[in-house]
C-alpha cells in the first residue's frame, strides 16, 4: 500500500490490505505528520493501484521531516521521520494510573478466542485499545507497527481521547511503536 499525503508520496507499506484508511491516518499521526485536530478533507483509496491518498486542509511539512531520519529497532530496520523521538521525554504516565493484571489475562483470553485472521491463518499480530477492562477496538496486520497504526487511525478518525486508555499488543514493542 503506497501512502500519499496531499500530493507527496510518503511510504509504501506491506500490509494485509484491510482498513487502508485507518492505516494511513494512523501512520501519519504516529509520524507527527497529522496532529489531533487537523482537518482531513478526504481519504481516497484505490484498491487496484494499492494507493491511499490523505488530503488535508493545510500545507504539510513533509519535506522538513524527511531531513531528519532515525533508524528504529524493528526487525525490518524501519525509519521514523522528523520530531517523533523529540516528544518522548514529554510523555508521562500519571502517577495514579492503575492497571489490573486480571484485565491483561482477560484481554489475552479474548484475543486468543475471538474469531480473527490470526486464528484462521496465523502469522498475524493484533492490537487492542481498551478503556479499563473494556475493549474498544481490535486491529490485526502482518506487521505489529501496522496494527498499531490502524488503532491510532481509528482513534484519530473517531476523535478518541487517549486518557484512561490501555493499549495491548500481541508482539513486542519496538522503538517506533513506543
Q: What is the meaning of each model-derived region?
A:
Residues 123-158:
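Protease-associated
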Amino acid at each position: 500500500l503506497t501512502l500519499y499525503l496531499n500530493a507527496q508520496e510518503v511510504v509504501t507499506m506491506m500490509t494485509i490490505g484491510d482498513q487502508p484508511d485507518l492505516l494511513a491516518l494512523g501512520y501519519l499521526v504516529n509520524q507527527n505528520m497529522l496532529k489531533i485536530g487537523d482537518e482531513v478533507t478526504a481519504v481516497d483509496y484505490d484498491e487496484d493501484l494499492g494507493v491511499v491518498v490523505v488530503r488535508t486542509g493545510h500545507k504539510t511539512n513533509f519535506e522538513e521531516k524527511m531531513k531528519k531520519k532515525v533508524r528504529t529497532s524493528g526487525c525490518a530496520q524501519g525509519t521514523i521521520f522528523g520530531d517523533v523521538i523529540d516528544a518522548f521525554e514529554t510523555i508521562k504516565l500519571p502517577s495514579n494510573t492503575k492497571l489490573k493484571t486480571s484485565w491483561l489475562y482477560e484481554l489475552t483470553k479474548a484475543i486468543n478466542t475471538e474469531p480473527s485472521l490470526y486464528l484462521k491463518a496465523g502469522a498475524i499480530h493484533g492490537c487492542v485499545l481498551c478503556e479499563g477492562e473494556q475493549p474498544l477496538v481490535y486491529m490485526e496486520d502482518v506487521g505489529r507497527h501496522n496494527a498499531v497504526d490502524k488503532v491510532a487511525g481509528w482513534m484519530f478518525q473517531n476523535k478518541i481521547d487517549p486518557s484512561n486508555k490501555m493499549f495491548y499488543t500481541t508482539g513486542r514493542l519496538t522503538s517506533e511503536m513506543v
